[in-house]
Amino acid sequence: MIKIIREMPHGVAALCLIQAFSTFSYAVQYSSLALFITKQLGIANLSANSIVGLFLSFSYIFQLIGGVIGSRFISNRLLFVTTILIQNMGLFFLAQANPSLLNIGLSLFMVGSGLNVTSSNSMLTQCFIPQDDRRESAFFLSYAGMNVGYCIGYIACGFFDYSNQYQYLLYASILTNSIALLIIIKNWAYLGDKNFPLPNLTKRNWYFIKNILAIAFI
């Protein structure tokens, strides 16, 4: 395994670690969100189920949006950094365990976690040329890192489900996201987009893009 990683281009090992650390926070939300809402915030089960359903549904929708934005309007590495920061803001609001902050916290985390899924895979793809056979092994390692993040996240959730004190779990998610952020910053030079079209856009294109982004933000 170590030999395979050493034969990979620069940035691949970093992306595998990023997958492991950044997946932890989503695993926490996926497995413990309903319990956090009902047991710690005291929200009714029916409302909690609706909130969790909307959260999961819109997370997949934002993955599609992230695929459109990445490499077109913003580089994938910058998109990933931005979305990690948005996730951490959402996790901080959730960690306050205040029902009035639930919607804004979940919304921020949902946007961040949804938009950055495609960016990490796109960065991994661009580490290779299309004819490079090592790309399949790289994606295998990347998904292995993702599974490690899910596994650790699920195990950690099991310890906190009995105490009903999810703040420490949410702060741990902020920590793992921050580690992923530091890794991508350290390997910034190796994870750039190839043939990034943004520098070649005309003023008219920029005006159109800014209007679209403003509408999306509103």
Give the ranges of each region predicted by the language model.
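Intracellular juxtamembrane helix-capping segments at the cytosolic ends
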Residues: 115-130
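Intracellular loop-helix junctions on the cytosolic face of multi-pass helical membrane proteins
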Residues: 1-7, 157-218
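Glycine-rich segments within core transmembrane alpha-helices of 12-TM secondary carriers
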Residues: 134-155, 161, 176-180
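C-terminal ends and interior cores of transmembrane alpha-helices
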Residues: 82-103
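Short amphipathic helix-loop junctions that connect adjacent transmembrane helices
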Residues: 29-47
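Central cavity-lining transmembrane alpha-helices of secondary-active solute carriers
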Residues: 52-70, 117
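Hydrophobic core of transmembrane alpha-helices in multi-pass small-molecule transporters
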Residues: 20, 101-116
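Cytoplasmic membrane-interface "Motif A"-like loop-to-helix N-cap segments
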Residues: 72-84
